[in-house]
């Protein structure tokens, strides 16, 4: 073997066999530190969850090497016979999970799935209705800073000021006045049951499409803990992470063949090129997990835990927007503790409790300050936390907020936060992740 060939072989051996730690210790270190953070902190961000080792393995597989523009059986590249199997499994499992006739599993994110529906069903300048961001909607539901708010005429609906619940008569009124081409239901911070049937009645009355973004509650729908929008909506979108407990990505479902064709064309070639086949593999694995009987128990536990956490927080003098929760999340009004969301998020973070500041309906504070935090139970429930643990977590949150109230500063109360942090580490140590003890 020549010296050049030997060098090439040696380089190839390193390329295919060296570990991440050997090749890039900086990235390896960041990942290791993030794993430590996830192990030792309580994750209460409602849009986050913990995937299984099987999902991690699928998403980290050699499928990342394969380009597969198009759809199964109709690709623009050769060598797609095995990734076709992967995508077809993901589609069939999603159909079974949600009772939908047509599914597109290619959207790379929640924003892109919603953009695909807009591209398929609307023209620039068309009118659509969506839940106002301040009432628990999403940026892609018509926020003026988002493409959805820039390209279309948006009419927002919101919650009532007295009880923070949706008033369906106040959804119907602007729909009749504005005759939107599409009505979008669903949100990111609404803790009550959605009346899909009434939304469809309103949509039919004004001749609009009904689109449901069930990204936050898809796992609860799959697990039988929230009514399904699929029989009512013309088209549904959902992320595949959050309560569904899969990899980060999006999905679109419909029972209408004509809409399905438009959706497929909007996703590819309208918005995306080659799909992320390693992510689609992770989606397929997560759907298989969600089809198992134990996922129904998981979904029930998510809701039970959320209700327990909300009641515990109320017992410590905090207000819960709309008075409680019927799903996996809650908005906590911090004003009884004289705290802002910004301060509370930072103080809880120092105590190893992760959440996000969040505006509450009719919030007097600025968006980067807020009067509330949003809390969710999917990740903690995946870890194995039950009602007892979430009651303890509620008490720990109140302890931090009471300390923050006494300190009345951005720095918080170091002694209280350290004491809570030690309790959190003890709690998380009883529920190891990925086979790790301690």
Curated annotation (Swiss-Prot):
Gene3D superfamilies assigned: Aspartate Aminotransferase, domain 1, Type I PLP-dependent aspartate aminotransferase-like (Major domain)
InterPro entries xref list: PyrdxlP-dep_Trfase, PyrdxlP-dep_Trfase_major, PyrdxlP-dep_Trfase_small, Ser_HO-MeTrfase, Ser_HO-MeTrfase-like, Ser_HO-MeTrfase_PLP_BS, SHMT-like_dom
Keywords, alphabetical: Amino-acid biosynthesis, Cytoplasm, One-carbon metabolism, Pyridoxal phosphate, Transferase
GO MF annotation, one: pyridoxal phosphate binding
Positions that bind (6S)-5,6,7,8-tetrahydrofolate: 133, 137-139
GO terms, biological process: glycine biosynthetic process from serine; tetrahydrofolate interconversion
Origin superkingdom: Bacteria
Keyword Signal: no
GO CC terms: cytosol
Site (Plays an important role in substrate specificity): 241
Co-factor requirement: pyridoxal 5'-phosphate
PROSITE patterns: SHMT
Localization annotation: Cytoplasm
Pfam families reported in the protein's UniProt record: SHMT (PF00464)
Keyword flag Ubl conjugation: no
Similarity comment text for this entry: Belongs to the SHMT family.
Biological role: Catalyzes the reversible interconversion of serine and glycine with tetrahydrofolate (THF) serving as the one-carbon carrier. This reaction serves as the major source of one-carbon groups required for the biosynthesis of purines, thymidylate, methionine, and other important biomolecules. Also exhibits THF-independent aldolase activity toward beta-hydroxyamino acids, producing glycine and aldehydes, via a retro-aldol mechanism.
Assembly information from the UniProt record: Homodimer.
Protein name: Serine hydroxymethyltransferase
């Amino acid at each position: 073997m020549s010296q050049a060939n030997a060098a090439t072989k040696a380089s190839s051996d390193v390329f295919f066999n060296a570990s991440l730690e050997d090749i890039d210790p900086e990235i390896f270190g960041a990942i290791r530190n993030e794993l430590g953070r996830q192990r030792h902190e309580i994750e209460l961000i409602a849009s986050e969850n913990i995937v299984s080792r099987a999902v991690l393995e699928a998403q980290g597989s050699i499928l990342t090497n394969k380009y597969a523009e198009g759809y199964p059986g109709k690709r623009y590249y050769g060598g797609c016979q095995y990734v076709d199997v992967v995508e077809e499994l993901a589609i069939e499992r999603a159909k079974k999970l949600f009772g939908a006739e047509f599914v597109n599993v290619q959207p790379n994110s929640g924003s892109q799935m919603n953009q695909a529906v807009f591209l398929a069903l609307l023209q620039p300048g068309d009118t659509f209705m969506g839940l106002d961001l301040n009432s628990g909607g999403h940026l892609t539901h018509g926020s003026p800073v988002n493409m959805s708010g820039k390209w279309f005429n948006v009419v927002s609906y919101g919650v009532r000021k007295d009880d923070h619940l949706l008033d369906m008569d106040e959804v119907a009124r602007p729909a009749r006045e504005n005759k939107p081409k599409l009505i979008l239901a669903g949100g990111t911070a609404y803790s009550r049951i959605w009346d899909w049937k009434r939304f469809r009645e309103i949509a039919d009355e004004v001749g609009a499409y009904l689109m449901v973004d069930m990204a936050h509650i898809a796992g609860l729908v799959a697990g039988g803990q929230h009514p399904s929008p699929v029989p009512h909506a013309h088209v549904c979108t959902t992320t595949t992470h959050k309560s569904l407990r899969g990899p980060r990505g999006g999905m679109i479902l419909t029972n209408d063949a004509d809409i399905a064709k438009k959706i497929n064309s909007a996703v590819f070639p309208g918005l995306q090129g080659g799909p992320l086949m390693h992510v689609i593999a992770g989606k397929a694995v997560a759907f298989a997990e969600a089809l198992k009987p134990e996922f129904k128990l998981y979904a029930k536990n998510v809701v039970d835990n959320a209700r327990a956490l909300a009641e515990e927080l109320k017992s410590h003098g905090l207000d819960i927007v709309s008075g409680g929760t019927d799903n996996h999340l809650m908005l906590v009004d911090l004003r009884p503790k004289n705290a802002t969301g910004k301060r509370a998020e930072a103080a809880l973070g120092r105590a190893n409790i992760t959440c996000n500041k969040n505006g509450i309906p009719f919030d007097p504070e600025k968006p980067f300050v807020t009067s509330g935090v949003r809390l969710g139970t999917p990740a903690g429930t995946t870890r194995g936390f039950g009602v007892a643990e979430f009651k303890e977590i509620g008490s720990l949150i109140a302890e931090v907020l009471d300390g923050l109230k006494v300190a009345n500063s951005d720095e918080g109360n170091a002694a209280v936060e350290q004491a809570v942090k030690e309790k959190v580490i003890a709690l998380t140590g009883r529920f190891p992740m990925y086979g790790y003890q301690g």
